[in-house]
Amino acid sequence: MSPTDGSARRDFEKALDIGRPPNIARLFPNSKALIVSGKVIDRAMIAKGGAIAIAANGRNHLVIRGALLAAHRANSPIIIEIAKSEGGANAYCAVNYWNIARQVDALCNELGITVPVAVHADHYGIKSTKDVEAAKVEIPTMFDAGITSIAVDASHLPDDENLLASIALHPLIPPWAGYETEVGEIKGSQGISTVEEALFLIQGLNAHDIFPDWIALNNGTTHGIQDSEAGIQVELTAEIHEALTRYEVSGAQHGTSGNDSDRLRRIAAETRTTKANVATALQMITWGVEVNEYGNARLDENGRFVKRSDQGVTDELWEEMVAYAVEKGWKSGDYKKLNLPFENKLLSQPREIRERMTEGVASFVYSLITEVFNAGNAAPLATEAILEAGSYDLGPKGSRIEDPADWTEERIRGRASSIERDRGPAGDFED
């Protein structure tokens, strides 16, 4: 929906003038795309109440295209994101941290998208001291390339190392940018996050004048294709969010694909979640793989994906993709690795095929926005947040409550040693 009336048009033009962060204004000086900080999206969802913004993982160009069209039709702000495993230095997608903002900006201008869009670096994983040092070089380059929000994910580390890594890297993040932190690596029903460790992370950050916009938890979901009906633990999520109330941090829901609509509606209504990541389902839809209401790809009796001939890529290209995966010895969960070698082949499909790939994503995301996450018609609230602030920088929601003297490195390590934590099984749980 375009801001066609005079007042809405003036608000949009003013937001374009003052609401685009410095990196975006520098990269795209003549753009009509309203690319904003992740903070803007969070504040719009808070203002609407019981609403969650879609964070669409753009594993291919047509996912980004479809998600932006859906947001525009729903008049909803949206987050377009890519994770380190998907789009970092050693990625399995052609879309990456350094080109995603350029794709978003180009598509917004091409398609006439007039809703606010944040560009988020999801799951910037930190697994070692070596990763911290590499991040000190890499993170600034991502903001140079147009990222406007980031999730620093050191949840793979012990609680004290997670906190200390987050503190060490925070000076690299522009103060205007959206910021997400994470506790409890996403592992499904094992290694579930607790109130104690969530408080430890948020209190420690608070003592160092770091005020996250979002916290992600392991609240029962997994990345990729779900193989159980367990899913999100709504009550646990609400309990943790309630414990964090005074720190004014919203929730970020990971592993959304594979959870039924009623459970997702409860997350919107009963918790403080304002961001929900959707990745695997959108990838599958562009390919034409049949997806159920949960966003799970359907498998036949032989464990193979069910491809619909009237959706996604041509049957000929799908057969080529399957043959490539078989040659590599990939199981169903590895099919995500097809994104990089097949991106150009996706883009070289006939126009009518590309359009149905895009429209499949647009239809799915539109339904999530309007029928599940209560985020329809929230775009004016995002614009309003910019105009009220008079700036691209909305500032933090929280303020310092904790005493820094209680959160020195020595005391952080001492506190962490008393936390009882089930880390769950070892292994690679990234997607």
Predicted regions and their residues:
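N-terminal capping/small domains of soluble enzymes
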Residues: 2-96
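C-terminal extensions of enzymes
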Residues: 2-26, 324-431
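Catalytic alpha/beta core domains of metabolic enzymes, predominantly
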Residues: 204-314
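Glycine-rich beta-to-alpha transition loops that act as phosphate-gripper elements at the mouths
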Residues: 57-58, 120-127, 185, 250-259
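C-terminal helical cap(s) of enzyme catalytic domains, especially alpha/beta-barrels
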Residues: 160-174, 225-226, 286-307, 358-369, ...
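Low-complexity, serine/threonine/proline-enriched polar segments
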Residues: 304-336
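Short gly/pro/ser/thr-enriched loop/turn and capping motifs at secondary-structure boundaries
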Residues: 87-88, 157-158, 282-287
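Alpha/beta enzyme core
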Residues: 39-46, 61-86, 95-102, 106-114, ...
